[in-house]
Amino acid sequence: MASKWNWSGTKGRRTPRRPYGRPYKSSVPTTRVVVHQSAVLKKDEVVGTEIKPEGDVARYKMKKVMLTCTLRMAPGELVNYLIVKCNSPISSWSAAFTSPALLVKESCQDMITIIAKGKVESNGVAGTDCTKSFNRFIKLGAGITQTQHLYVVLYTSVALKAVLEHRVYVEV
């Protein structure tokens, strides 16, 4: 016979549809942390930044991330991006990723996991800059703890200004 107690030790509510309460795991409270960054990216260069909560958070687990990036670039240009998870910090972006396609190099394949990828192509009238953006909502499954690292990696075909904002849903 199934137990009428949940994992926290309290009895669940009885209803006509469910006369005996099922055990359920109590939800951990989450907080939302918003981080705003801006950078000027160089032409044909692979760059990246870490996605993590700022402040005095010593122990945490990230479950979800909402990523927004706004780019100002000339028409006909391309931006590739990757969101990757890694167990150790990445010191050299060009040593870990190939240049135009952002593929993980063979020497780093055992420590880098690709979570999401995409591209942004600009269109418009020649001679004027256009603003493009992308939004990604990333569910991280079991979560990423403070000992792991989450990065967004960008490759641009032209020098441009990027504004990166991310909202991190953290279990503390």
Swiss-Prot record:
It is found in: Virion. It comes from the Viruses. Residues 1-26 are annotated as: Disordered. The keyword Cell wall biogenesis/degradation does not apply. Pfam families: Nanovirus_coat. Keywords: Capsid protein, T=1 icosahedral capsid protein, Virion. GO terms for cellular component: T=1 icosahedral viral capsid. Belongs to the nanoviridae capsid protein family. This is Capsid protein.
